[in-house]
């Protein structure tokens, strides 16, 4: 009710943006509903063990133990619930603890161009029951994003038939450097993930 009232009022008074990131109030309300309201179906990855094959950068390595599987989405600032990699690719394995039937895996990314945080180029998902012999699930190429707005993007692999597995591997190809159109051209760029959702 409060969110609906807030949305109604900002429309009534023609509030164009909420902050310096140029997100409209309508976008804010939509994001809030999608990211922060309780969801009916819980992720199978909640509380799972995460093993990094390519560890996060700096302080994010220590934060990375639980952040990707704590059920909490990060906000528009990259200091809360986000794990980052700078100038490199990233890779990790989610251990569900036992073999389970899954239908989808989704990784949530942040785009904040002013902080040199860009969406990655590609995400590859694979799975294994034994943690050694992985079967490729899906490779997803992401379109380049140049907007100055803060954005979130879920990158999802789905299967119509259930897949029985214990381990899910996520491999991310980052941009590694700021591209030619970015004012940080040639300098290391980041990508950030806040949550992995498995259902």
Describe each model-derived feature in a short phrase.
Residues 14-18, 47, 71, 161:
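Glycine-centered secondary-structure boundary/capping sites
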Residues 65-67, 141, 185-187:
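Short intrinsically disordered coil segments
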Residues 1-40:
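Catalytic domains of carbohydrate-active enzymes that cleave complex glycans
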Residues 2, 17, 26, 39, ...:
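Generic low-complexity segments that are intrinsically disordered, proline-rich and/or Lys/Arg-biased
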Residues 73-138, 151-199:
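Aromatic, loop-rich ligand-recognition surfaces of beta-strand-rich domains
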Residues 34-73:
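Predominantly extracellular/luminal regions of secreted and cell-surface proteins
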Residues 44, 58-62, 87, 144-153:
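Short, surface-exposed linear segments at secondary-structure transitions and domain or protein termini
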Residues 136-146:
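Solvent-exposed serine/threonine-rich low-complexity stretches and specific carbohydrate-binding patches
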């Amino acid at each position: 009710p409060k969110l609906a009232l807030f949305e109604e009022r900002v429309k009534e008074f023609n509030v164009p943006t909420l902050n310096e990131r140029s997100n409209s109030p309508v976008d804010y309300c939509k994001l809030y509903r999608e990211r922060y309201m309780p969801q009916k179906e819980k992720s199978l990855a909640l509380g799972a063990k995460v093993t990094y094959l390519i560890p996060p950068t700096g302080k994010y390595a220590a934060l990375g133990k639980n952040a990707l599987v704590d059920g909490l989405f990060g906000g528009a600032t990259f200091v809360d619930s986000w794990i980052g990699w700078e100038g490199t690719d990233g890779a990790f394995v989610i251990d569900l603890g036992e073999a389970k039937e899954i239908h989808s895996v989704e990784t949530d990314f942040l785009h904040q161009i002013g902080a040199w945080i860009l969406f990655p180029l590609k995400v590859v998902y694979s799975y294994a029951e034994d943690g050694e012999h992985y079967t490729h699930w899906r490779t997803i190429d992401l379109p380049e994003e140049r907007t100055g707005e803060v954005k979130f993007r879920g990158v999802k692999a789905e299967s119509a038939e259930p897949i029985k597995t214990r381990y899910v591997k996520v491999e991310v190809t980052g941009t590694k450097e700021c591209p030619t159109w970015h004012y940080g051209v040639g300098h290391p760029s980041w990508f950030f993930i806040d949550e992995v959702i498995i259902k």
